[in-house]
A protein has these predicted regions:
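Catalytic cores of the polymerase beta-like nucleotidyltransferase superfamily
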Residues: 1-150
Length: 150
């Protein structure tokens, strides 16, 4: 999403991007299993020189409540995690398949293309977290329209 904003506003493709998120779903919720994936992916992508944030969506309920002081139920697939993202414009997932890619975007791409940050009023929504994220984005992309939560 931020890369798209950068293209639309004529900025460098990596401008303002702190990290790249990679998420997957593995029923093995052990830290050891996730750590293996993190290390393998980092080794494969290390040449890019960017920070990669890799998370098993099956494990999110184990750490999210302590980090964000909000409840988070166990998920049954990666798209369940996307459905709970803080903003609708970030609710985009791409998965490689044998013959191409599958894209999951429950709210479409209009907000991404329109440089709009819109809250996702899900059960784990935090107005404070949204305000902080929107303020960071607005400082980097002043063209951004930020929709206030209801």
């Amino acid at each position: 999403m931020q890369s798209v904003w950068n293209v639309l506003t004529g900025r460098a493709i990596d401008y303002g991007i702190a990290d790249y998120d990679v998420f997957y779903f593995d029923p093995d919720t052990s830290w050891d299993a996730e750590d293996v994936v993190i290390r393998k992916l980092q080794a494969r992508l290390d040449h890019l020189g960017v920070k990669i944030e890799t998370r098993n969506q099956a494990r999110v309920h184990l750490w999210y409540p302590a980090k964000h002081s909000l409840p988070y139920p166990p998920l049954s697939c990666s798209t369940d995690g996307i459905d709970r993202f803080l903003t609708q414009n970030t609710q985009v997932g791409v998965r490689r398949t044998d013959d191409g890619f599958d894209v999951y975007a429950p709210h479409g791409f209009d907000d991404v293309a329109g440089l709009i940050a819109r809250p996702n009023p899900g059960p784990n929504f935090s107005a404070a977290n949204y305000a902080a994220k929107a303020a960071r984005w607005r400082a980097l992309w002043p063209e951004l329209t930020v929709i206030a939560p209801e």
